[in-house]
C-alpha cells in the first residue's frame, strides 16, 4: 500500500504519481520471466560480438548450434536467421573471460560510448578492463597478487618497463629511461600488445581460474618477444591455474609454449588441437602434425628455389 504523502528529498519534490510509477516498475521487474531476460542478454551478446551475423551467411535459415561442455554439463544455443531459437544452460560459469586479439583496440580507448555499454563485444570489454581497475579485488587480494606476479612482471618488463596512466585527454606510459610519458598510440604494435596485457593483469582481471583467450598473439611480435609472451602465459597458468585458449600459426610460439610448460612442469595441463575442415582434432600426443602443417610454407619456398 503506497502512502499518500509528498516527500521532499534533496530539495526534489516526489509526489504520489512518481511513487506509484516507481512501484509499478519494481513489480514488473519482480514478475518478469528470468529465462526471457537471460535469453535477451545472450542474444545481445552475440549480436554485439558478431555484428548480427551469427549464422552461416549462405544458410541463415538452417540451425546453427554453439555448445560449451564442462565436465559433461552443457551450455548450448541454437540460432536460426541470427535469432536464438533454443537456449539450454546446465551449469553456471562464474569465471570472467578476457579475449585479446589485436593491439589495434588501443584506437578505441577514447571512444565516448564504450564505458556506458552494459553488454559489449570483446574489444569493448578489453577497453573497459584497460581503463578501469577491478573493484571486486580486495586490498588483501592485491597484496597476495603482488607476490605471485613477480616472475610475470619481470618477463613483461623486458618489453614494456613502465606503467600506463590515463586522464581525460590521453593515455600515456611512463617508460624508464624516457624523459617524458609516451602516448600509447605511438608505441609499436608489439609493445601495445604487451602494454594491454600488462595493464589488464595489474588492474586485477587475471585471477584464479580466469579464462584468457589469445587469437594469434604472435602477430606483430619479434620471435624473441614471442618467447617472452609464452613465458608469461605459462607463469600465469602456473600461478593462477587460468584456462588459456591460444590460436597460433607460429612454430616459434608453439615451441616456446611447449618448452616453458616442460620447464615449469605443467606439460600435463596442456592440450594441443589441430583445426581441420572435418573438425577439431586433439593432437596432444602427436604435436608433430601441427609442425608439419606450419612448415608447408617453407616447403613451398624450397620448391620455388629449386626451380631456379
Place the predicted regions along the sequence by residue.
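Phosphate-coordinating catalytic segments in nucleotide- and nucleic-acid-processing enzymes
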Residues: 2-209, 278-308
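Conserved aromatic-histidine-acidic binding/catalytic patches
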Residues: 185, 221, 245
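Walker B motif beta-strand of ABC-family P-loop ATPases
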Residues: 211-213
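Walker B catalytic acidic pair
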Residues: 215-217
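Conserved D-loop-proximal element of ABC-family nucleotide-binding domains
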Residues: 222-223, 227
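C-terminal lobe/lid and adjacent interdomain/linker elements of RecA-like ASCE P-loop ATPase modules
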Residues: 228-308
